[in-house]
Design a protein with these regions (language model features):
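Feature for soluble, non-membrane regions of globular proteins
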Residues: 1-176
Length: 176
């Protein structure tokens, strides 16, 4: 199986001023492309050669294959979750109901999610995920890990590796 770059559903400058075109060019065009290339070079001849990204991330031991597969999966979810002109500024329908049920309010969720992202030491990801019973969870995952390793389904991912925000926000992770 050959892993490919996800196609962005928006122009590289469409997320400005929140995420600059320069950041998209480097983050998507350079960092993610490198992870895709690395994964395509690592998996031939291994038990993961014909596995999808979720399976690799859920089952591979720590190491180069896991790290690169994790970053391809994480970045694919990350870049595809954005919309330059969202229809709503807050979740609606079932997700809104679940957030209210599990966090009390959307504002409480934002506070908890932001605290997780800002409080993650070093590089990694903050995630909103759902378990098999429909309960929402906020997790912090180091480096290229993903909640699928714990049997969760990721719904929203926030990249707190410095390459995701440093060109626009420098050392101000919380502003990102």
């Amino acid at each position: 199986m050959t892993y490919e770059m996800p196609k962005l559903p928006y122009a590289n400058n469409a997320l400005e001023p929140v995420i600059s075109q320069q950041t998209i060019d480097y983050h998507y065009g350079k960092h993610l492309q490198t992870y895709v290339n690395n994964l395509n070079n690592l998996v031939p001849g291994t038990e993961y050669e014909n596995k999808d990204l979720v399976t690799i991330v859920a089952t591979a031991p720590d190491g180069a294959i896991f790290n690169n597969a994790g970053q391809v999966l994480n970045h694919t979810l990350y870049f595809l979750q954005f919309s330059p002109k969202p229809a709503h500024s807050e979740p609606t329908d079932k997700l809104a109901e679940a957030i209210k049920r599990d966090f009390g309010s959307f504002d409480n969720f934002k506070k908890e999610f932001t605290a997780a992202a800002v409080g993650l030491f070093g590089s990694g990801w903050a995630w909103l995920s759902v378990d098999k019973n429909g309960k929402l969870h906020i997790t912090k995952e180091a480096n290229g890990s993903n909640p699928v390793r714990a049997g969760l389904i990721p719904l929203l991912g926030f990249d707190v590796w410095e390459h995701s925000y440093y060109l626009d926000y420098q050392n101000r992770r919380a502003d990102h």
